Amino acid sequence: MARPKIALIGAGQIGGTLAHLAALKELGDVVLFDIAEGIPEGKALDIAESGPSAKFDARMSGTQSYADIAGADVCIVTAGVARKPGMSRDDLLGINLKVMKSVGEGIAAHAPNAFVICITNPLDAMVWALREFSGLPHEKVCGMAGVLDSARFRHFLADEFDVSMKDVTAFVLGGHGDTMVPLVRYSTVAGIPLPDLVKMGWTTQDKLDAIVQRTRDGGAEIVGLLKTGSAFYAPATSAIEMAESYLKDQKRVLPCAAYVDGAYGLKGFYVGVPTVIGAGGVERVVEISMNKDEQAMFDNSVNAVKGLVAACKGIDDSLS
């Protein structure tokens, strides 16, 4: 039986890391696409030459032609401009919207049956636009954000409590940006909710509040440190976790920017929510109950995403 085919649209820092991780996990053969001649070919060859030492079997190739992604089982989209210090994800809207149009048309023409994961920022608006431009089924197009934001939240919590991050469960709702909603009440250490850990004296509410804010600022913190780019290891690892759940029908419960139509009181809208990802794509949106404060924060985040979607429609009339 043929190995799955994974198309990576964009061969920058995230794209190259995605290719390496996909190879190491032997998820399938990898095609790196980029408009920059030589970059995808060079990275593909470099990773392929690591195969004998890393002991993986996967074909790696690079291309500037969408025709070479034909029949891809998974497409992960990282193409676009990355943030620089002082920029918000929203500042990238106009430039990256044009990129999504080109990518969406390329996927529709050559890989219409693929499961598509978008990483390009501003994430929630870009995954919506990518779905519109591609015309693929909503359950086959989603955005990588919640897995990354939750991973950052879990890392900070594990550091605070000095425990294994394997025992920390946490997830984040809402848009991928300053308005994201890390849910303290639903986050646990070995099954113990964070509010109970405050009562037990393991931490303080002030420290938890600081961790929540650091989670919101997680991407900007790395942009500020790198100065010439944005995060790539953690975003790539998060997207691979989603792709693996799809390819292996693991049915993992993972937060991502998914199409919500009825749940959370939303109608036909992409935003970060817990989902089940399996062979059918986003097979289910998990609707949780929120208290008044959580709902207010989620509504604020949804409104921010709606503003970005409206801006996209203002830029490209075909989206209206």
Curated annotation (Swiss-Prot):
Binding site for NAD(+): G10, A11, G12, Q13, I14, G15, D34, N96, I119, T120, N121
Residues holding substrate: R83, R89, N121, R152
Example of a GO MF term: L-malate dehydrogenase (NAD+) activity
This protein's UniProt keywords: NAD, Oxidoreductase, Tricarboxylic acid cycle
Active site, per annotation: H176 (proton acceptor)
A Pfam family the protein falls into: Ldh_1_C
EC number from the UniProt entry: 1.1.1.37
InterPro entries from the UniProt entry: L-lactate/malate_DH, Lactate/malate_DH_C, Lactate/malate_DH_N, Lactate_DH/Glyco_Ohase_4_C, Malate_DH_type3, NAD(P)-bd_dom_sf
Similarity annotation: Belongs to the LDH/MDH superfamily. MDH type 3 family.
Protein name stated in the entry: Malate dehydrogenase
Annotated gene: mdh
